[in-house]
């Protein structure tokens, strides 16, 4: 059968779903089970099922496909053309499982706090609840330099529901107690620059997620890797060291109504932009332009393998390149949540070297 390209809005959904770890993937070896990494034969792209050998639409979610349908396939796409999308999806899926371990254990610790302990911290200051992230999930793929993004995913039932439930309950506990956590913060205007993945996706080895400054990476609000030097293999420049609000702004503050998460897993800054409603979900906040960079190689590949008429029909004037450039310009608006741009009334922070904790703002500073 003849196939067509997915539409532009479906590709946008695909990118967004990749950074939520929610892309459905089919492989001949594993079927629709993505817990074991395998080369995809099909992916779900905005409600359409697309062939990953040509990016043609071969079906929809209304019909559960059990094999790759026979179709007129140009077989010009290679895994390296879309591996960035696959990488973002799988790393985020690993990240969410790690964050579930973290928030569930912090929630359990907070549940054990007695009214007497809470009153003592309110009166005298100090830490009320403390958690060493490095002991939370010893089996996490992020614990070892030898781990790979292709490592098997832990099977978790209703992952998103559990994350939302624990995260919401933890927020309510913190807010109702007027406490300050050191793993939450608000987006200070446009200071956050999304995410730049360290290393190309096809490099299967993660660089170590924590080093001699492990507390800084795991217990602090890290939000960016700044550009510094150009790497010809990556095509753009990177600064290898992390950037923190304290480093960028000097002393940086935090209040009990700030929102975001650490620890940072797999070099993916998990920063939550404040929604206009004040509500924050358990997903990494990643700038739209960073999301779009994940499909740059795919854009180039599709331009070479599809006729300009079909591309123009699916994506409008200018084809893939035109769609890519237009969406890049709109990305901060159409692909990211609205950000609150006010600084809260903040507690001052210095080097932020202490572990993940919840306590009194007068002492945490």
UniProtKB/Swiss-Prot annotation:
Modification after translation, per record: Cleaved during virus the endosomal proteolytic disassembly of the outer capsid.
Residue ranges covered by zinc fingers (CCHC-type): 51-73
One protein family per Pfam: Reovirus_cap
Keyword annotations of the record: Capsid protein, Host cytoplasm, Host nucleus, Host-virus interaction, Inhibition of host innate immune response by virus, Inhibition of host interferon signaling pathway by virus, Inhibition of host PKR by virus, Interferon antiviral system evasion, Metal-binding, Outer capsid protein, RNA-binding, Transcription, Transcription regulation, Translation regulation, Viral immunoevasion, Virion, Zinc, Zinc-finger
Single GO molecular function: zinc ion binding
Single GO BP term: symbiont-mediated suppression of host innate immune response
Main location, first listed in the record: virion
Domain of life per record: Viruses
GO cellular component: host cell cytoplasm; host cell nucleus; viral outer capsid
Compartments, record wording: Virion; Host cytoplasm; Host nucleus
Role summary: Stimulates translation by blocking the activation of the dsRNA-dependent protein kinase EIF2AK2/PKR, thereby inhibiting the host interferon response. Sigma3 prevents the activation of EIF2AK2 by competing with the kinase for dsRNA-binding.
Family as reported in the entry's similarity comment: Belongs to the orthoreovirus sigma-3 protein family.
Quaternary assembly: Heterohexamer of three sigma-3 and three Mu-1 proteins. The RNA-binding form is probably a homodimer.
Protein's name in the database: Outer capsid protein sigma-3
Source species: Reovirus type 2 (strain D5/Jones)
Organism phylogeny: Viruses, Riboviria, Orthornavirae, Duplornaviricota, Resentoviricetes
Gene name per UniProt: S4
């Amino acid at each position: 059968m003849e196939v067509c390209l997915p539409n532009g809005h479906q590709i946008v959904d695909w990118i967004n779903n990749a950074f939520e770890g929610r892309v459905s993937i089919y492989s001949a070896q594993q079927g629709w089970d993505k817990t074991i990494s395998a080369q995809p034969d099909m992916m779900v792209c905005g409600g359409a099922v697309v062939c990953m050998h040509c990016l043609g639409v071969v079906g929809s979610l209304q019909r559960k496909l059990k094999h790759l349908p026979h179709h007129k396939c140009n077989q010009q796409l290679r895994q390296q053309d879309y591996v960035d999308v696959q990488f973002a999806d799988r790393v985020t899926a690993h990240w969410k499982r790690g964050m579930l371990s973290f928030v569930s254990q912090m929630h359990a610790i907070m549940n054990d706090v007695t009214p007497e302990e809470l009153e003592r911290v309110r009166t005298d200051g100090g830490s009320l609840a403390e958690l060493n992230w490095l002991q939370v999930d010893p089996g996490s793929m992020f614990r070892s330099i030898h781990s790979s993004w292709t490592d098997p995913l832990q099977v978790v039932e209703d992952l998103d529901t559990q994350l939302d439930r624990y995260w919401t309950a933890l927020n309510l506990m913190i807010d109702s107690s007027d406490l300050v956590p050191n793993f939450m913060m608000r987006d200070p205007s446009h200071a956050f620059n999304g995410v730049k993945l360290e290393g190309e996706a096809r490099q299967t080895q993660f660089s170590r997620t924590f080093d001699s400054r492990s507390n800084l990476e795991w217990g602090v609000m890290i939000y960016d890797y700044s550009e510094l030097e150009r790497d010809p293999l990556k095509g753009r420049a990177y600064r290898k060291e992390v950037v923190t609000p304290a480093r960028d702004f000097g002393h940086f503050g935090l209040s009990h109504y700030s929102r975001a998460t650490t620890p940072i897993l797999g070099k993916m800054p998990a920063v939550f932009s404040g929604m206009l409603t004040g509500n924050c979900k358990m997903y990494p906040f990643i700038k739209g332009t960073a999301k779009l960079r994940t499909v740059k190689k795919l854009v180039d590949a599709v331009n070479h393998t599809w006729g300009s008429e079909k591309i123009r029909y699916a994506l409008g004037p200018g084809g893939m390149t035109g769609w890519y450039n237009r969406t890049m310009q709109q990305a901060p608006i159409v692909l990211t949540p609205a950000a609150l741009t006010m600084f809260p009334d903040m507690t001052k922070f210095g080097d932020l070297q202490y572990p993940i904790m919840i306590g009194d703002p007068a002492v945490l500073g």
